[in-house]
Structure formats: C-alpha cells, structure tokens
Design a protein with these regions (language model features):
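Short, surface-exposed "cap/lid" segments of acyl-processing enzymes
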Residues: 1-64
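A structural signal for isolated positions on well-ordered beta-strands in alpha/beta enzyme cores
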Residues: 56, 97, 121-123
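Short secondary-structure capping/turn micro-motifs that flank functional sites
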Residues: 64-65, 128
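Conserved catalytic-core motifs of eukaryotic protein kinase domains, centered on the activation segment
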Residues: 67-69, 135
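Alpha/beta-hydrolase active-site loop
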Residues: 69-90
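Alpha/beta-hydrolase-fold enzymes
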Residues: 89, 93, 107-200
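Gly/Ala-rich beta-loop-alpha elbow adjacent to hydrolase catalytic centers
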Residues: 99-104, 108
Length: 200
C-alpha cells in the first residue's frame, strides 16, 4: 500500500509457525525506517521475523508544501488507522501489536489510547510521552521559538533543517567525531559498510 505521505511494507515471517498477532511498526516521521533493516546481521525487522511474527512497517515520506496543514490528528487517526485496518484485514486479526519508535512511539501511544479495541499490545522504543519533562537541549531551544510563526512562514520544516536541529544534541559526535571514527577504522570493511549504510 502506498499513498502520498507513506508506504506500508509487509515482511513475511521467516519460520513456519507464525504468531496470530501481526506487528505494525510505526517509525519516526523525521528519520528513515530502513534503519531497522539495514543488513541481515543487524536488522530489528529480521530478528522479529525469525521469532515468527508477520511484520508491517509504516514508512513515512517527507511532507511537501501541500502538506502544511496535515496535523497529528491526520497522522494518528487517518494514516495509522488506515494501516491498522489493512494489517487486520490481511491477517484476519481482530487486534494487532502496535510497535513505535521515537516519534512513532508517541503516535502509537496516542493511537492506542483512542482505539484500544484494535490493539492487543503496545510496544514503544524511545517514546516522548510527557514533553513538559523533556530537558534536552533541543526541547529547551524549541520552548523559546514561536512555532506557529515558523510554520506560517515556511510551512513544514525541511528534513535537512530538522537534522541540523538534532545535531545540536551532540554537535561533536554528529558533526566531526563520526568522521574521525571513519578514518580510524578505514581498514575495517565491516565498519566502513555500516557507516556508508547509515550516512547515505
């Protein structure tokens, strides 16, 4: 299934005995979901498939100017809900497992609280549930910004600008240090391959 703002990928179990409860993985809006399946020996998706789960991965596309007014309500109650229903229908399942990562965890928690009748299990990794307790550098900076003015001026923040914001969290590690590590490990083919996969 593919729409303008997302595509739903389906991975079939690697074993004969398949769990009756399929998993829908909801990834973050600002990163790419392929990080969960970079290579066979470092794949969260492959690990779940080997445990007998049928996996669906919600891969968000970058919003464009025409998506300026798309809201969290649209993401949670339209797009995620559409995917949940596809997973339910494909697997003849009344309830599914919703597995979120980062912002996907927050959206999955919202969805589960609103649609408990469709969710058997909620699994979250790195969720932000209570933003009032977030004391990271980026949270403190964002509290000083006029978000409404930012959105009305430029619309959606381009992905490269979001990356710049996230690099503020660990500027040396995100900026220079990763390249020093590459130089130090340039003769290690496995390290170089992993670096290239993540940095592409």
């Amino acid at each position: 299934c593919e729409t303008r703002l997302y595509r739903l990928l389906h991975y079939h179990s690697l074993v004969k005995k398949v769990s009756p409860t399929p998993i829908l993985v909801v990834y973050a809006l600002v990163n790419r979901s392929y990080v969960l399946d970079l290579q066979p020996n470092k794949s969260w998706i492959r690990h779940l498939l080997a445990q007998g789960f049928d996996i669906y991965l919600l891969d968000w596309k970058s919003p464009t100017r025409m998506d300026k007014y798309v809201s969290f309500d649209d993401y949670v109650n339209s797009y995620i809900d559409d995917c949940v229903e596809i997973v339910q229908n494909n697997n003849s399942a009344d309830k599914i497992t919703l597995h979120g990562y980062c912002m996907g965890s927050s959206m999955s928690a919202m969805y589960t609280s609103l649609h408990q009748e469709k969710i058997k299990n909620l699994v979250t990794i790195a969720p932000v549930i209570d933003t009032s307790k977030d004391s990271t550098v980026i949270a403190n900076i964002s509290r000083q910004m006029d978000i409404d003015k930012l959105v009305s001026t430029i619309g959606n923040l381009p992905p490269e600008k979001l990356y710049e914001c996230y690099s503020i969290l660990k500027p040396f590690k995100q900026g220079v240090n990763k390249y020093f590590n590459l130089i130090e490990n340039i003769d290690n083919e496995s390290f170089v391959q992993n670096f290239l996969r993540i940095e592409k």
